[in-house]
Curated annotation (Swiss-Prot):
Organism: Mycobacterium tuberculosis (strain ATCC 25618 / H37Rv)
Active site: C337
Comment field (misc): The a and c carboxylates of hydrogenobyrinate are activated for nucleophilic attack via formation of a phosphorylated intermediate by ATP. CobB catalyzes first the amidation of the c-carboxylate, and then that of the a-carboxylate.
UniProt pathway annotation: Cofactor biosynthesis; adenosylcobalamin biosynthesis; cob(II)yrinate a,c-diamide from precorrin-2 (aerobic route): step 9/10
The keyword ATP-binding belongs to this UniProt entry's keyword annotation: yes
Protein known as: Hydrogenobyrinate a,c-diamide synthase
DNA damage keyword on record: no
Source species taxonomy: Bacteria, Bacillati, Actinomycetota, Actinomycetes, Mycobacteriales
GO BP of this protein: cobalamin biosynthetic process
Enzyme Commission number(s) of this protein: 6.3.5.9
Enzyme class: ligase
GATase cobBQ-type domain: residues covered: 255-441
Listed SUPFAM superfamilies: Class I glutamine amidotransferase-like, P-loop containing nucleoside triphosphate hydrolases
Length: 457
């Protein structure tokens, strides 16, 4: 099925992409459309707001994590049942992963993904502090790369009617259509912390109200008919299929419990789909207040912000003990970033699960970026020597016991030969976030281990 899309990009971060993209998703839905929302890059937070606006899962399109060949199929899978897609970009339009030499065209940029899908770009321009200069900016972005088509501009944070008039004249001079002009509106600001926006799950009811406000403002100030008219795509791609990706390798049904709630909010929609395709029953539990579901054979602990909830996580000693006992019985446990912090003995002095011997602490040092990683040892997910591309995104540090076996060794500039994570028995825990669609064998292997082991909580 061919579904047209628009990519919402900007000259730089902080221009209002998430606000405009989320509001556009909500406004199109309010107008009767079924909208498929996407985010370029590995970001887990923005898709949570997209999902609130669209009423369906937000998904990621990241050619660095999954490769170029999967972008079209993952897009086709994600738009099933929709009549239009909105793709929120990352950073500036042409910003992505910089090669070792620097200065090369950046892989994984919004422009890269838009070109792969044939999606026109709507540029969000922060109009504060400028007027006629917008013409030069638009001219530069429109002519920089012939593979990227700027279909229109949405002017954000416009100061007055006179300011808007001058800006529109500048856009006309550059030959770029104005699709909307958003006034400066304080109510559209979302809360942030050291790793970006506060997640929609944590923000709760206020997140829903914020999305409603974004929707109302975009519906009032953006020409939705013009947006729809400029949407486009290349020929239809065959949709990605989780069943074909993993095959049904489980010898018997297995129950996989995935941590959720406010502390564990990072995950890709395709992960649960692939676990089910591999034969698992997927159930969620909240480690802040719940115990493991009855009959749990394996546990997935995704990323999130456990350092915001250390006392609450520590206080639920029942589920901590259950996870420890399940891991000790050889059950597969897959933990990424927040999950790793939850599995160690203590986090900032608070007792955690004690599955991985070591301690973790919050720091002021940001570790952020793509990582080329090689599996150090066979595990419940990967074979020794298997290569993956993942993403690191945290401000914490773990000190492991001397006898630990690392999960990964990183390769590449600035991180060459860095060890990450820990593997023992059925446990695979590390800082590295991976996209399951890129490593379907790991998902199939995890479920097969769960079905064979079946210690059951």
């Amino acid at each position: 099925m061919r579904v047209s899309a628009v990519a919402v990009a900007a000259p730089a971060s902080g221009s209002g992409k998430t606000t405009i993209a989320t509001g556009l998703i909500g406004a199109l839905r309010q107008a009767g459309h079924t909208v498929a929302p996407f985010k370029v890059g590995p970001d887990f937070i923005d898709p949570g707001y997209h999902a609130l606006a669209a009423g369906r899962p937000g998904r990621n399109l990241d050619p660095v994590l999954v490769g170029e060949r999967l972008i079209g199929p993952l897009y086709a899978h994600g738009v099933a049942g929709a009549d239009i897609a909105v793709i929120e970009g990352v950073l500036g339009l042409f910003d992505g992963r910089i090669g070792p030499a620097g200065g090369a065209p950046a892989a994984g940029s919004t422009a890269h993904v838009a070109a792969l899908l044939g999606a026109p770009v709507i540029l969000v321009v922060d109009a504060r502090g400028q007027s006629h200069s917008v013409a030069a900016l638009l001219h530069g972005f429109s002519t920089f790369d012939t593979a990227t088509r700027i279909a229109g501009v949405i002017l954000n944070r416009v100061g007055s009617a006179r300011h808007e008039q001058v800006l529109r004249q500048a856009c006309d001079q550059a030959g770029v259509a104005v699709l909307g002009a958003i006034p400066r509106t304080a109510e559209l600001e979302l809360p942030t912390r050291y790793l970006g926006l506060v997640t929609a799950v944590e923000y709760g009811r206020r997140a829903r109200l914020a999305v409603q406000a974004m929707t109302a403002v975009v519906a009032r100030h953006v020409d939705l008919a013009a947006v729809i008219a400029c949407a486009g795509s290349q020929a239809a791609h065959p949709p990605w299929d989780p069943v074909i990706a993993v095959g049904n390798t489980a010898r018997q049904p297995a129950t996989v419990a995935i941590a959720a709630g406010r502390a564990f909010t990072f995950g890709y929609a395709e992960h649960a789909e692939m676990l089910r395709a591999a034969g698992a029953e997927v159930v969620e539990f909240d480690p802040l207040s719940e115990t493991l579901p009855e009959g749990t054979d394996a546990v997935v602990l995704p990323g999130g912000f456990p350092e915001q909830f250390t006392a609450e996580l520590s206080a639920n000693d029942t589920v901590r003990r259950q996870i420890n006992e399940l891991a000790a019985a050889g059950a597969p446990v897959h933990a990424e970033c927040a999950g790793l912090l939850y599995l160690v003995s203590e986090l900032d002095g608070h007792p955690m699960c004690g599955v991985v011997a070591g301690s973790a602490r919050f720091t002021q040092h940001l570790k952020l970026g793509y990582r080329d990683a090689v599996a150090v040892v066979d595990s419940a997910l990967y074979s020794v020597g298997e290569r993956v591309v993942g993403h690191e995104f945290h401000r914490t540090a773990v000190t492991f016991a001397d006898s630990y076996q690392p999960a990964w060794v990183y390769q590449g500039q600035d991180v060459d030969d860095v060890r990450d994570g820990a593997v023992h028995s059925g446990v695979h825990a590390s800082y590295l976030h991976t996209h399951p669609a890129a490593t379907p064998g790991a998902v199939a292997r995890f479920v097969a281990h769960a079905a064979c082991n079946t210690p059951r909580a």
